[in-house]
Each structure stands twice: as C-alpha cells, then as structure tokens.
Design a protein with these regions (language model features):
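Short, well-formed alpha-helical segments that are part of the catalytic scaffolds
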Residues: 21-39
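A conserved acidic beta->alpha catalytic loop
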Residues: 36, 47-55
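Glycine-rich, basic loop-to-helix element that forms the pyrophosphate-binding segment
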Residues: 70-87
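Short aromatic/hydrophobic "clamp" motif used to bind/position activated sugar donors
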Residues: 92
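Conserved donor NDP-sugar-binding/catalytic core segment of glycosyltransferases
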Residues: 104-134
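Short, flexible, basic/aromatic active-site loop/helix in glycosyltransferases
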Residues: 132-157
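Donor nucleotide-sugar recognition loop
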Residues: 169-184
C-alpha cells in the first residue's frame, strides 16, 4: 500500500459517507434507524414501492434524507445497488431499516477504518447477547474495541469503501439474483 492510499484511508469522515437504507413497508421502524444516524450524514432511502406519500413525509421530516421510489419491490440486493449508484461519496454504510445504531457506532467504524489498511468492508459487532456469531467465530479471546478479521459479515450493517469496491465490481456489489437473504 502506498502513502497516497494511507492518506485516503485516513480521510474518511461523516462528510464523505452516505448511508443507504433499503425499505419495504418499513414506516414503523425506519424513523428509529434514521434518528440513530444523525442529521449531518447524507441518507439515501430506497423504498421498494411506489409510495409517494412516504417519500414526501420522510424527506420533509429529515432534510438529510433523499428517498428514491423504485416503483416495485426490487429486493435487498438490487435495492442496495440502486442506492450505491445514487450516492456520490467515497464510503457507504448499508443499513437495514430496523437497525438502531448505538451511541457512537458510526464514529467507531470510521476510527476502525483508519486502523485497517485499504479496507473494503467493515461491520460492527451486533449485540453480543442476541447475536454471538462473531464471538463464536473469533473465540472468546479478543478485544471487542479492536478491529479483527472475520470470514463474512452480516448485511444488516456494513461500511463499504466504494472507491476500492468500484475498481473490483463496477457498482454491482450485491447479487441481484437473491431477492432477500444471502445477497451480500
């Protein structure tokens, strides 16, 4: 890795990060998700419907939200790909609409990105009491505040280095052949 890449990695901020949320009839949970992100980060909601009232309401309530209606239910993979095509930032945080970020989760992922040379994907640990997948995979002897490698990440929350991934896959990061589950 070169000095230029190192400087680039160090430059991730809330300003060059977009959040992408794919929604389908998620009106009852998506507001908690958006509220947990913060108002200074651009959020792109891909609503897998043609619900213009939802679009109008969410964009009025949240000035940092852009809602794109897909007109039909594309599924998670195609919805996330549509979101990625509609952001003009170097990094994207993919979130499911029922995710509520705790405390400084975004800032912690940004900090972790600075510790990992040339990362492609970073994911937070979900509530270890509810979802012990990473702990079981890694074992019990790890520091949960330090980044560590895993075989895979869950798609509910993933920080993507778009600049790096675009070189690899030219915008189709998610397999659109899978409508829901296993698309990531």
């Amino acid at each position: 890795f070169s000095i230029v890449e190192y400087i680039y990695i160090m430059s991730i901020t809330r300003q060059n990060l977009s959040v992408i949320i794919v929604s389908y009839r998620s009106d009852h949970v998506i507001k908690n998700c958006i509220d947990s992100i913060g108002s200074e980060i651009e959020i792109v909601v891909i609503d897998n419907s043609n619900n213009f009232e939802f679009k109008k309401k969410i964009e009025f309530e949240y000035k940092n939200v852009k809602c794109i209606l897909s007109k039909k239910n594309l599924g998670m993979g195609a919805g996330n790909n549509l979101g990625i095509k509609n952001v003009n930032k170097d990094f994207a945080l993919i979130l499911n609409p029922d995710v509520t970020l705790e405390n400084n989760c975004v800032d912690e992922m940004i900090t972790a990105s600075k510790e990992i040379e040339n990362f492609a994907v970073i994911a937070p640990i979900s509530s270890k009491d509810k979802y012990p997948n990473y702990i079981l995979d890694k074992g019990h002897n790890f520091d949960p505040v330090k980044p560590f490698k895993v075989k895979s990440v869950d798609g509910y929350a993933m920080l993507l280095n778009l600049k790096k991934l675009k070189k690899i896959n030219d915008f189709n990061f998610f397999d659109e052949n899978f409508f829901l589950y296993l698309e990531n």
